[in-house]
Structures are given as structure tokens and as C-alpha cells.
């Protein structure tokens, strides 16, 4: 055979493969999601092996470890006691609440670490939805946004670097941007959950926060979030959401979930000039961890390949529960 073009020439040795490698992973690509609670001990999440609800002291140690591994941003999610949950989720803008308190402590102890927060009502709602639910089961868009603005401002006052609206209410990015700017927080960024799909991959996360929709004898509660989260069948809709969020002032656009939506990551990366983030969500994490615990797969190889696929699809940032493990593996390689 006399073939002039032989792609295998560039695969011949590890050195050559490294020379022509198109995408690379680094610890600074990762945003590390952390669950926190008011208890004075860490508590493993049964549906997410190796992941915990952290107490404040444990949180400081874990964030310090992440910084030392090269991770430069964490995102905080609260497990709120049922006694504090209400229909309007008002605890979300309590200046002395769990999230503002955690932000202030982290900024004192590890000031260099960037902190992202979550803006949505579901952890704080007795109904388990991201917005206010009326008697007919409708999720109230504009009324919810008024609460979200208060939540975002509370987080910014505590020292958050990035606000992460995950609620999927129409117009919330612009409303939050205007609220932040009007209070002097023009330097606080917005990482918008731009294409957040109504996905079955969120199950373990909702277990971690006890944030799934709940039955209520006094009114209708939808058992899913499909009236505000996106239909998994749609891709063009993601471009509409992207254009809106970018116009309204989002700094970074996110796709959630990640693995099953790499086409959306790619489309947004070519459609928008904003950095794209992908969320390697709880269901994806738990599937890998469960299979690895049974020795059905090589956890390290699967995780690094999965994370690399996000970069290859066009993501600049990856939210992943594997962040510390992956960072350590990259150091050891």
C-alpha cells in the first residue's frame, strides 16, 4: 500500500500525541459544587457516594483543599430545614441565612477563591419548585423574579463573585443584572443556567437538598418542572435562551445537564461569544460512582474522558462533583 496521508503518524508516540492534542483539562476549568447544612458534622449523601453535606468547619477545609489542588471557583447549595421553608421561599434572602453566612466565612478564610451561588426558590420552598406556585399549580414568573432579585442582592452583599440563576423564569437575568447594578454590584458576574433542561438526571441532587416538588393538600403542585425548564427534545430553543441571556447581561452561559446535551454545548459555543459552562450533574456523577464501586469501569479514565468531552464540545468551564478527584489525577499524570 502506498498511502501518502497516514493519520497514524501523529499517534505514534505519547510525545507526538501530546504535541498535537487539541484540548486539555486543567483544575481551573472546574467549578466545584458543594452542599452545606446547619449541622455541626458532615453527612454523606446516600444517592451520591463520596459527596457530603458539609458543616461550616468542614466546608472551610474542603474549599482549602480545592484551592490547593488548583480549583478556582466553588458553587454553594443549601440544605434548608423544613421549618424555614415557605411558599414564597423568603428564607433565601435572609441576610443571616446559611448561604450568606457561608460566603462571609469563606471570603475571610480563603479570600482568593471565587464563589458562585445558586438563585432559585426550590431549596427554600415548601412546594419544592423554583418559583412561587399559585392555587392552580401555575408557577408565577414575575412574582418569583421579585424574590430572586432579593436573593441575588443578599448573596452579593455577603461577597459572592458570581450569581447563578437556575430558576428558568423568563427575564430573570436582566432583572437580576439591573438589581445588582442599582445597588453598586456591577462587578458581580452572572453565570446563567441558560439551557437548563427538565431532566431525569437531577434525582440525586434533589435528594441532597430535599428540593423535589412536594404534595400540598391546599393546592395543586405540579410533580415536575416542565413548565419552566426546557423540553429535552428541543435544541433551537437553547439558541433563543442564549440570545436572551446574553442580551440581558449574563457573563457566562451554562448548559445543564452535560453528557446528554453535548450538542447543545457545541451549538451555544458556536452561536455565542460568551464563555460556555457545562454542568456534569448529580445523576451523571452517581452512575459513574456506582459502576466504579462495582469495578465495572475504571473511574479515573471514565471521569477524565467525560470531562474532556465537555471541553471538546466547546465548554470553557465544567461544574462537576468530580472536581477534586479529577484535579488530583491531573496532577499525578
Each predicted region: which residue ranges?
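N-terminal amphipathic/basic leader segments beginning at the initiator methionine
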Residues: 1-21
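Alpha/beta enzyme core
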Residues: 2, 13, 25-31, 37-333
Amino acid at each position: 500500500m502506498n498511502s501518502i496521508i497516514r493519520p497514524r503518524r501523529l499517534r505514534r508516540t505519547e510525545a507526538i500525541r501530546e504535541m498535537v492534542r487539541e484540548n486539555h483539562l486543567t483544575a481551573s476549568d472546574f467549578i466545584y459544587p458543594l452542599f452545606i447544612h446547619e449541622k455541626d458534622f458532615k453527612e454523606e449523601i446516600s444517592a451520591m457516594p463520596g459527596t457530603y453535606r458539609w458543616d461550616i468547619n468542614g466546608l472551610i477545609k474542603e474549599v482549602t483543599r480545592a484551592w490547593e489542588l488548583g480549583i478556582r471557583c466553588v458553587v454553594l447549595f443549601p440544605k434548608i430545614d423544613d421549618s424555614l421553608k415557605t411558599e414564597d421561599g423568603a428564607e433565601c434572602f435572609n441576610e443571616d441565612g446559611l448561604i450568606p453566612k457561608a460566603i462571609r466565612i469563606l471570603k475571610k478564610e480563603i479570600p482568593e477563591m471565587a464563589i458562585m451561588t445558586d438563585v432559585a426558590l426550590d431549596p427554600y420552598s415548601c412546594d419544592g419548585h423554583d418559583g412561587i406556585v399559585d392555587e392552580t399549580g401555575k408557577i408565577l414568573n414575575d412574582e418569583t423574579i421579585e424574590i430572586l432579585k432579593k436573593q441575588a442582592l443578599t448573596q452579593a452583599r455577603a461577597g459572592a463573585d458570581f450569581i447563578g440563576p437556575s430558576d428558568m423564569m423568563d427575564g430573570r437575568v436582566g432583572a437580576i443584572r439591573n438589581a445588582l447594578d442599582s445597588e453598586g454590584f456591577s462587578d458581580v458576574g452572572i453565570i446563567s443556567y441558560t439551557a437548563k433542561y427538565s431532566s431525569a438526571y437531577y434525582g440525586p441532587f434533589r435528594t441532597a437538598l430535599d428540593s423535589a416538588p412536594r404534595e400540598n393538600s391546599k393546592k395543586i403542585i405540579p410533580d415536575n418542572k416542565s413548565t419552566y425548564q426546557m423540553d429535552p427534545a428541543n435544541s433551537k430553543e437553547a439558541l433563543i435562551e442564549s440570545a436572551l441571556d446574553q442580551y440581558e447581561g449574563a457573563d457566562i452561559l451554562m448548559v445543564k445537564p452535560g453528557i446528554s446535551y453535548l450538542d447543545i454545548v457545541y451549538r451555544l459555543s458556536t452561536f455565542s461569544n460568551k464563555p460556555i459552562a457545562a454542568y456534569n450533574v448529580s445523576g451523571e456523577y452517581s452512575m459513574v460512582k456506582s459502576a466504579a464501586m462495582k469495578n465495572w469501569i475504571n473511574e479515573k479514565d471514565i471521569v477524565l474522558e467525560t470531562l474532556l468531552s465537555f471541553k471538546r464540545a466547546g465548554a470553557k468551564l465544567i461544574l462537576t462533583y468530580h472536581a477534586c478527584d479529577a484535579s488530583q489525577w491531573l496532577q499525578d499524570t
